[in-house]
Protein backbone atom coordinates (compact mmCIF):
# COMPACT_ATOMS: atom_id res chain seq x y z
CA UNK A 1 0.00 0.00 0.00
CA UNK A 2 1.10 3.58 -0.21
CA UNK A 3 0.24 7.25 -0.19
CA UNK A 4 0.22 9.38 -3.33
CA UNK A 5 -1.08 12.96 -3.16
CA UNK A 6 -1.38 15.68 -5.79
CA UNK A 7 -2.01 19.37 -5.10
CA UNK A 8 -2.57 22.35 -7.39
CA UNK A 9 -1.89 25.83 -6.04
CA UNK A 10 -0.89 29.13 -7.61
CA UNK A 11 -0.42 27.63 -11.07
CA UNK A 12 1.81 24.79 -9.88
CA UNK A 13 0.96 21.10 -9.58
CA UNK A 14 2.95 18.83 -7.26
CA UNK A 15 2.70 15.06 -6.82
CA UNK A 16 4.38 13.18 -4.01
CA UNK A 17 4.52 9.65 -2.75
CA UNK A 18 6.11 7.56 -0.06
CA UNK A 19 8.60 4.79 -0.78
CA UNK A 20 7.29 1.77 1.11
CA UNK A 21 6.54 -1.55 -0.58
CA UNK A 22 4.87 -4.26 1.45
CA UNK A 23 4.25 -7.93 0.90
CA UNK A 24 1.41 -8.98 3.13
CA UNK A 25 2.18 -7.58 6.57
CA UNK A 26 5.92 -7.17 5.97
CA UNK A 27 7.86 -4.20 4.66
CA UNK A 28 9.91 -5.43 1.70
CA UNK A 29 11.49 -2.15 0.60
CA UNK A 30 11.45 1.42 1.80
CA UNK A 31 12.86 3.22 -1.23
CA UNK A 32 10.46 2.48 -4.09
CA UNK A 33 10.12 5.46 -6.44
CA UNK A 34 6.37 5.72 -7.08
CA UNK A 35 6.43 9.22 -8.57
CA UNK A 36 8.10 9.74 -11.94
CA UNK A 37 8.37 12.25 -14.74
CA UNK A 38 7.23 11.29 -18.24
CA UNK A 39 6.98 12.80 -21.72
CA UNK A 40 9.88 15.25 -21.91
CA UNK A 41 9.53 15.93 -18.16
CA UNK A 42 6.18 17.69 -18.79
CA UNK A 43 4.01 15.02 -17.14
CA UNK A 44 4.28 13.51 -13.67
CA UNK A 45 2.63 10.31 -12.52
CA UNK A 46 2.26 8.64 -9.15
CA UNK A 47 0.97 5.12 -8.63
CA UNK A 48 -0.52 2.98 -5.88
CA UNK A 49 -1.30 -0.71 -5.80
CA UNK A 50 0.67 -3.68 -6.99
CA UNK A 51 4.12 -2.41 -7.95
CA UNK A 52 4.53 -4.64 -10.98
CA UNK A 53 1.03 -3.77 -12.21
CA UNK A 54 1.68 -0.07 -11.71
CA UNK A 55 4.91 -0.24 -13.73
CA UNK A 56 3.00 -1.90 -16.57
CA UNK A 57 0.32 0.80 -16.48
CA UNK A 58 2.88 3.59 -16.29
CA UNK A 59 4.67 2.21 -19.34
CA UNK A 60 1.38 1.92 -21.24
CA UNK A 61 0.46 5.48 -20.27
CA UNK A 62 3.85 6.72 -21.42
CA UNK A 63 3.26 5.10 -24.82
CA UNK A 64 -0.14 6.81 -25.03
CA UNK A 65 1.49 10.16 -24.20
CA UNK A 66 3.99 9.69 -27.02
CA UNK A 67 1.23 8.67 -29.43
CA UNK A 68 -0.93 11.68 -28.51
CA UNK A 69 1.96 14.20 -28.26
CA UNK A 70 1.63 14.71 -24.52
CA UNK A 71 -2.13 15.40 -24.46
CA UNK A 72 -2.92 14.29 -20.90
CA UNK A 73 -6.69 13.73 -21.08
CA UNK A 74 -6.63 11.98 -24.45
CA UNK A 75 -3.80 9.70 -23.30
CA UNK A 76 -5.58 8.85 -20.02
CA UNK A 77 -8.87 8.11 -21.78
CA UNK A 78 -7.15 5.90 -24.35
CA UNK A 79 -5.34 4.05 -21.56
CA UNK A 80 -8.65 3.56 -19.73
CA UNK A 81 -10.27 2.18 -22.89
CA UNK A 82 -7.45 -0.30 -23.34
CA UNK A 83 -7.52 -1.15 -19.63
CA UNK A 84 -11.22 -2.02 -19.81
CA UNK A 85 -11.11 -3.98 -23.06
CA UNK A 86 -7.79 -5.85 -22.81
CA UNK A 87 -8.38 -9.01 -20.81
CA UNK A 88 -4.88 -9.17 -19.31
CA UNK A 89 -5.01 -5.53 -18.21
CA UNK A 90 -8.35 -5.93 -16.42
CA UNK A 91 -6.57 -8.01 -13.79
CA UNK A 92 -4.04 -5.32 -12.95
CA UNK A 93 -4.42 -3.91 -9.46
CA UNK A 94 -3.17 -0.35 -9.52
CA UNK A 95 -4.25 3.29 -9.68
CA UNK A 96 -2.46 6.34 -11.01
CA UNK A 97 -2.58 10.08 -10.68
CA UNK A 98 -1.28 11.82 -13.79
CA UNK A 99 -0.60 15.55 -14.07
CA UNK A 100 0.85 18.25 -16.25
CA UNK A 101 1.15 21.96 -15.54
CA UNK A 102 -2.55 22.65 -16.03
CA UNK A 103 -4.57 19.52 -15.25
CA UNK A 104 -4.47 16.34 -13.23
CA UNK A 105 -6.48 13.14 -13.30
CA UNK A 106 -7.10 9.95 -11.39
CA UNK A 107 -6.96 6.81 -13.51
CA UNK A 108 -8.65 4.11 -11.42
CA UNK A 109 -8.30 0.37 -11.28
CA UNK A 110 -11.65 -0.03 -13.01
CA UNK A 111 -10.55 2.08 -15.96
CA UNK A 112 -12.22 5.31 -14.86
CA UNK A 113 -10.68 8.70 -15.60
CA UNK A 114 -11.68 11.28 -13.00
CA UNK A 115 -10.90 14.99 -12.96
CA UNK A 116 -11.14 16.33 -9.40
CA UNK A 117 -13.55 19.07 -8.34
CA UNK A 118 -11.04 20.35 -5.82
CA UNK A 119 -7.33 21.05 -6.12
CA UNK A 120 -6.35 17.78 -4.40
CA UNK A 121 -6.26 14.12 -5.41
CA UNK A 122 -4.92 11.25 -3.32
CA UNK A 123 -4.77 7.48 -3.64
CA UNK A 124 -3.48 4.51 -1.71
CA UNK A 125 -3.95 3.32 1.84
CA UNK A 126 -2.92 6.70 3.22
CA UNK A 127 -4.71 8.67 0.52
CA UNK A 128 -7.66 9.82 2.60
CA UNK A 129 -5.38 11.07 5.38
CA UNK A 130 -3.19 12.94 2.90
CA UNK A 131 -6.21 14.40 1.11
CA UNK A 132 -7.74 15.68 4.34
CA UNK A 133 -4.43 17.23 5.40
CA UNK A 134 -3.86 18.86 2.00
CA UNK A 135 -7.40 20.26 1.86
CA UNK A 136 -7.02 21.71 5.35
CA UNK A 137 -3.73 23.36 4.39
CA UNK A 138 -5.20 24.75 1.17
CA UNK A 139 -8.12 26.27 3.10
CA UNK A 140 -6.02 28.04 5.71
CA UNK A 141 -4.10 31.28 5.34
CA UNK A 142 -0.49 30.30 4.72
CA UNK A 143 2.33 30.82 2.28
CA UNK A 144 2.91 27.14 1.57
CA UNK A 145 3.53 26.12 -2.04
CA UNK A 146 1.88 23.12 -3.69
CA UNK A 147 5.10 21.16 -3.11
CA UNK A 148 5.22 22.11 0.58
CA UNK A 149 1.57 21.14 1.06
CA UNK A 150 2.26 17.74 -0.54
CA UNK A 151 5.23 17.26 1.80
CA UNK A 152 3.16 18.06 4.90
CA UNK A 153 0.25 15.88 3.75
CA UNK A 154 2.62 12.94 3.19
CA UNK A 155 4.11 13.41 6.67
CA UNK A 156 0.65 13.37 8.26
CA UNK A 157 -0.40 10.30 6.27
CA UNK A 158 2.84 8.58 7.31
CA UNK A 159 2.06 9.30 10.95
CA UNK A 160 -1.28 7.49 10.63
CA UNK A 161 -1.00 4.88 7.86
CA UNK A 162 1.15 1.85 8.72
CA UNK A 163 1.63 1.09 5.01
CA UNK A 164 3.30 4.45 4.23
CA UNK A 165 6.75 5.68 5.22
CA UNK A 166 8.68 8.96 5.34
CA UNK A 167 10.89 8.35 2.30
CA UNK A 168 9.14 10.85 0.03
CA UNK A 169 9.64 11.76 -3.61
CA UNK A 170 7.90 14.95 -4.72
CA UNK A 171 7.85 16.32 -8.26
CA UNK A 172 6.39 19.63 -9.43
CA UNK A 173 5.21 20.77 -12.87
Swiss-Prot record:
Transmembrane segments: none
Any single Pfam family the record assigns to this protein: Proteasome
UniProt-listed Enzyme Commission number(s): 3.4.25.2
Means of activity regulation: Allosterically activated by HslU binding.
4Fe-4S as UniProt keyword: no
Keywords: Allosteric enzyme, Cytoplasm, Hydrolase, Metal-binding, Protease, Sodium, Threonine protease
GO cellular component, one term: HslUV protease complex
CDD domains linked: protease_HslV
InterPro entries: ATP-dep_Prtase_HsIV_su (IPR022281), Ntn_hydrolases_N (IPR029055), Proteasome_sua/b (IPR001353), Proteasome_suB-type (IPR023333)
Reaction equation(s) it catalyzes: ATP-dependent cleavage of peptide bonds with broad specificity
Cell location: Cytoplasm
Quaternary state and interactors: A double ring-shaped homohexamer of HslV is capped on each side by a ring-shaped HslU homohexamer. The assembly of the HslU/HslV complex is dependent on binding of ATP.
Family according to the record: Belongs to the peptidase T1B family. HslV subfamily.
PANTHER family in the cross-refs: ATP-DEPENDENT PROTEASE SUBUNIT HSLV, METALLOPROTEASE TLDD
HAMAP family: HslV (MF_00248)
Protein name: ATP-dependent protease subunit HslV
